[in-house]
Amino acid sequence: MSVMSGDEVQFQGDYDDYITYLKRRIRQLELQVRMLEADKERLERELSRLRSEMSRLRQPPAFAGTVIEVLDEDRAIVQNYNGPRFVVRIAPWIDRKKLRPGTRVALDQRTMAVVEILPTSKDPTVLGFEVIERPNVTYNDIGGLKKQLQELREAIELPLKHPELFEEVGIDPPKGVLLYGPPGCGKTLMAKALAHEVNATFIRVVGSELVRKYIGEGARLVHELFELAKEKAPTIIFIDEIDAIGAKRMDETTGGEREVNRTLMQLLAEMDGFDPRGNVKVIAATNRPDILDPALLRPGRFDRLIEVPLPDFEGRLEILKVHTRRMKLKGVDLRAIAEMTEGASGADLKAIATEAGMFAIRERRTYVTQEDFLKAVDKVLGNERKLLQQITSHEVIYG
């Protein structure tokens, strides 16, 4: 039996260590190879994407046109805007079911073939009506309108959140609500709170924004407004100051009034016409319900007419509590303030709270006293009464 010398033992130990080092190095290199292969695949995908993007950018622009008539599976009559009509081929990848008269399409420059279906064009004004940022008003910020809020939520919010309740009962949910009452009583505020609470598209428009100079422009805006609402359903449309376009129609009218009447008739057709409206709810607000056209007020268009009156004593007290909850009050009797502000609107009460705070700031105080509120009541309501007296006397003098 041979015995290894000391040098041989040392060499064998170095050899084993070297083998271990090589194995570890091989594993490291294999890991690097896998990482490089993954990077290569990623870069190849990026290269393919960039080549595809370059190919799309190199494509010549297409003409925009409108389908006039679909002849068969492969051909259609199209019209370039304000230009001649062409009988063209339809690309095989186009969904024939979506091609209808009036559909906007992209046409190839050389062959005029239909190569793409374009979305419906909309006036930028209509797109601007959509409310992107939700108002920060909640139901808790509204005082004295519990009954009105309940009726509004039942008609608009409940069908959007729990449509199954109406299906079980076997009734159709209300389609529209009209809020009417004196100025400053919270009609727009209720709509803002509803927009904050519901998970639906909210479109706000003032009635006067739908009035246009040229014939048919206002009616077109109304049509595009409801088309946008249908596309983004569930949707709530809030029309503020609807009396601007919803006044009673007269026999003798000027050119401008006839255009307003055309806009109103388009609104009537959109709200309850031949085509179904879908999951689109309409809320309108006005200070003048007496001048609205009767066709606008019938069920099917506005199923609920909600009066938003001047607040009573309890309502005024609730409104004062809402507007003073962040104020530092010292010795203030809100019940007494509510009693002496009979006939005041919610806007008046907010102005009173603001003026009371201004009186405190004027005297370099961080708290508000009863005396501040008394002076604020006299300033806000006293000025209003004087202004009304001046207007009345002016009408008496000048007719």
From Swiss-Prot:
Output the superkingdom of the source species: Archaea
InterPro entries hit by this protein: 26S_Proteasome_ATPase, AAA+_ATPase, AAA_lid_3, ATPase_AAA_core, ATPase_AAA_CS, NA-bd_OB-fold, Nucleotidase_PAN, P-loop_NTPase
Listed binding positions for ATP are: G184, C185, G186, K187, T188, L189, H323
Protein name as it appears in the record = Proteasome-activating nucleotidase
Which keywords does the record carry?
A: ATP-binding, Chaperone, Coiled coil, Cytoplasm, Nucleotide-binding, Proteasome
Q: Where, per UniProt, does this protein localize?
A: Cytoplasm
Species the sequence originates in: Pyrococcus horikoshii (strain ATCC 700860 / DSM 12428 / JCM 9974 / NBRC 100139 / OT-3)
> What SMART domains does UniProt report for this protein, alphabetically?
AAA
* Chain's role: ATPase which is responsible for recognizing, binding, unfolding and translocation of substrate proteins into the archaeal 20S proteasome core particle. Is essential for opening the gate of the 20S proteasome via an interaction with its C-terminus, thereby allowing substrate entry and access to the site of proteolysis. Thus, the C-termini of the proteasomal ATPase function like a 'key in a lock' to induce gate opening and therefore regulate proteolysis.
This protein's major location comes to cytoplasm
Task: Give a yes or no for keyword DNA damage in this entry.
Answer: no
Write out the ranges of the annotated region (Docks into pockets in the proteasome alpha-ring to cause gate opening): 397-399
| Database matches in Pfam families | AAA (PF00004), AAA_lid_3 (PF17862), Prot_ATP_ID_OB_C (PF16450)
Known SUPFAM superfamilies for this protein?
Answer: P-loop containing nucleoside triphosphate hydrolases (SSF52540)
